[in-house]
Every structure is written in C-alpha cells, then in structure tokens.
Amino acid sequence: MKGLLTAGGHGTRLRPITYTKNKHLIPIANRPMLTYAMGYMADAGIKEIGIIVNAGDDEIEKSCGSGKELGVKLTYIPQGAPLGLAHVVKIAEPFIGDDKFLFYLGDNILVGGVMKFVDEFEASGSNCHLVLSKVSDPERFGVPEISGDRIISVEEKPSNPKSDFAVTGIYLYDSSIFEAVNSIKPSARGELEISEAHQYLLDSGKSVSFSEITGWWKDTGKPSDLLEANRLVLDNLRGKNSAKVDNKSSVTGR
C-alpha cells in the first residue's frame, strides 16, 4: 500500500500566517503539521508516500527532504492549480499505479494514527473506505448515508444531511478510484469533487465501507482550529523522566 498526502493550496483562511509559510508546515506542538501524517503512515507500514505540492514551490521539499528521517520515501507531485481533491487523485495515478493507497489531507490531525483504518479497509474487501467522524454541523462537510456496514450515498455540504457524520480527510482506495476521477465532470465551482467520485463508485456497483473515529479529529483550516489542535496534541503528550526517587518520597501531578 502507498500513501498520498496533500500539501498544496494557499491556506487563505490562515492568513497572515500563510503569507510566509505553507500551512502544512505550521507547527503543532512544535512539529510541522505535515509530519504527523507521515508518521501515521509510517506506523501503519506505508513507506512510499506521494506528496502533492504547488507547482514551482519547493518549500515542502526543502523541509521534508527525502523522508529518510521518518523512515519513508517521499515523491513530490506538482499540481498546477487547486482543481479539487479528485483532481489530486487523478494526477497521482502514475505514482500509485495498481496499488491500494491511503489518501490523507495534510492539514488533518487525529489521535491514534491510521493503522486501525488500514486494517479495517483490508478486512472489508471494499473498493473504497471512508473514515467518518460525528459532528454537530455536518452541512459543512461531505455527508454519507449509511446502511448497515456500507455507505449507500455521499453528498457534499448538503442543506439537509442524511446523517450526523462527516467524511474526514482520510480515504482508502483500490485502483477503481481512477476510473471514477477520470469520469466525473467539474462542479459549479470548477473543481473535481471527491464526493462525486465516491458517488460514481457507488453508482457503478462498487462497495464503499467506513470506519468511525472514536477519539478526536481536527481539520486545521482556521486559526481557531490551530489553537485547538495544539491543545489536543499537547494534552495527549506524556513525558518521561528517568530520575530515581527514594522510597520515602512521593511525587504528585503529571
């Protein structure tokens, strides 16, 4: 299995921070945001990762290099313009080939990594596996309609959501996704929408399974999200102290 990671776009909602730094390199708990996703993939046994970057911008490559320090091999894939997530998948086909792959939006942070989702995708036998999270405002996201252990429809930012689940920025596919992204048409905003690709799979008789995130998940698209992501990550860090304390003393606190 390979990995595909987004690190392009312009981060307009995070200005003025992103005037001088790619949003995927903004530190969360003193680590570039993008390195969390790489670490999740490496922990799940995914060692070959393609990173979508803005054409002509080498900031991500200068920061992440070959990936050797994280135990992965990075391939940089330029995208000329932000034409939608399905377009990201489309231009990555030469890198992915016939392999299954994990597609991860680089500005997403979650607790627990992705190994559970990889295992559940492999066990499901499905063509596509979406990772969902319950939210209070599903109309802001792609929203699935669920029947049993399968998804039967997906709608992007619906006015009347059919569930209280959001499709997060974590997706798993086999090679059938490439037929979908090469067949759909641009939306009204001129982008190839990933929800349309998922619906194409469903309409073509492909199976779409899902996992639910049981801990926290954060899309760090806004300044308030960055603050919350820092708080969540720091709250889950556990320090280590190898000092010895004699048996007549006691230590309290974290």
Predicted segment positions?
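Conserved N-terminal catalytic core of the sugar/cofactor nucleotidyltransferase
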Residues: 2-5, 13-16, 27, 31-105, ...
